[in-house]
């Protein structure tokens, strides 16, 4: 029996809607990263964008376990000498773009490279409960029901 290899023309993508309210960030991100890569499908092929389109709503209502809400620090560099910057998870979630916490968690679980960048374009994250993709008829996935550790509160 030959090893199956998915061809890009044969890929079928679904639209998936996930409500992130009360979900643990890391557990949500691993499930979303696997969906974006297509690892949940039997047709998974490492070099083909076989994943689904994922919509995440209520990204501002995700939770951290332990003291990570106050203590977890995100770092980035401006490119200038001495230009290291840092913010805590709390500052980002209470700031202008709280959806970046979920975006960065998923982005850092996807392989870096051209295929990873293409797969990240299939992710849409919204801080509120509204999204403009109702025409795609996304299938709702209940992450909290998969495992009791996935949700808090």
From Swiss-Prot:
Keywords assigned by UniProt, alphabetized: Ribonucleoprotein, Ribosomal protein
Gene name of the record: rplM
Pfam family, one: Ribosomal_L13
Molecular function terms from GO: mRNA binding; structural constituent of ribosome
Function: This protein is one of the early assembly proteins of the 50S ribosomal subunit, although it is not seen to bind rRNA by itself. It is important during the early stages of 50S assembly.
Name of this protein: Large ribosomal subunit protein uL13
Quaternary assembly: Part of the 50S ribosomal subunit.
Family in the record: Belongs to the universal ribosomal protein uL13 family.
Superkingdom: Bacteria
